[in-house]
Swiss-Prot record:
It catalyses: L-glutaminyl-[protein] + H2O = L-glutamyl-[protein] + NH4(+). This is Probable chemoreceptor glutamine deamidase CheD. The keyword Hydrolase applies. The lineage of its organism: Bacteria, Pseudomonadati, Pseudomonadota, Betaproteobacteria, Burkholderiales. It is an enzyme of class 3 (hydrolase). Belongs to the CheD family. One of its GO terms (biological process) is chemotaxis. Probably deamidates glutamine residues to glutamate on methyl-accepting chemotaxis receptors (MCPs), playing an important role in chemotaxis. It comes from Bordetella petrii (strain ATCC BAA-461 / DSM 12804 / CCUG 43448). The keyword Zinc does not apply. HAMAP family: CheD. InterPro entries: CheD-like_sf, Chemorcpt_Glu_NH3ase_CheD, Cytotoxic_necrot_fac-like_cat.
Length: 223
């Protein structure tokens, strides 16, 4: 099972549009910045990203999860692909970096149905509903949200001041990024299907009854 350190985003680059250092968060990853002048970016399809910060401490971060919750009894549910685990990891890492729980505030994005053939799965809708319910339960106010619909999104989050730049991606203008979001949704569908498929059990038929060779009664000797 991957550790939290393994799930921390490591793809740093310089964003020429915003003229600042940036880090790209992929599905099942997170990133936390404490006082850094950095942009945290991601591309979302049916996945959801929660951007959470403590404005007083200047500590903020983002996660990117594929599904709301796993089977609590399964070790595989404790991975960043599931929202329940991804939210816990992000909040705990923020607190470790100096944030105070009572000052946390959130902005949430994603949950789109970017592939019409998969809209019946409602993965994006389930993710969106999950993140809002989770934050409400934890008492973390949601200051902004852009959830649902049929668009892929590119998110740029500036944890130092809380700004978020959202671009809805039109397929004919942003083919590469929309393709990423579509692949993400296919992966989420596959993971969801596997999570709800019961383990296959090989059934053994009852052992065949042993065959006995029956001996006929010896015939009576005749004189």
């Amino acid at each position: 099972m991957p550790s939290r350190l393994d799930a921390r985003a490591t793809r740093h680059y310089f964003d020429s549009a915003f003229h600042c250092p940036a880090v790209k968060v992929l599905p099942n990853e997170y990133y936390v910045a404490a006082g850094e002048d950095i942009m945290i970016s991601t591309v979302l399809g049916s996945c959801v990203a929660a951007c959470i910060r403590d404005p007083r401490a200047g500590v903020g971060g983002m996660n990117h999860f594929m599904l709301p919750e796993g089977d609590g009894d399964s070790p595989s549910s404790a991975t960043m692909r599931y929202g329940a685990f991804a939210m816990e990891v992000l909040i705990n890492e923020l607190l470790k970096a100096g944030a105070a729980r009572e000052r946390l505030e959130a902005k949430v994005f994603g949950g789109g149905a970017v592939l019409s053939a998969m809209q019946q799965m409602n993965i994006g809708e389930r993710n969106a509903r999950f993140v809002l319910n989770y934050l409400n339960t934890e008492g973390i106010p949601v200051l902004a949200q852009d959830l649902g619909d049929v668009h892929a999104r590119r998110i740029g989050y500036f944890p130092r001041d809380g700004r978020v730049m959202v671009r809805r991606l039109a397929p004919h203008h942003h083919k590469a990024e929309v393709l990423i979001a579509q692949r993400e949704q296919v992966a989420a569908q596959t993971a969801s299907a596997k999570a709800h498929t019961p383990p296959q059990i090989e059934r053994f038929s009852a052992p065949a009854k042993p065959r006995f060779e029956r001996f006929t009664r010896p015939s009576t000797a005749t004189s």
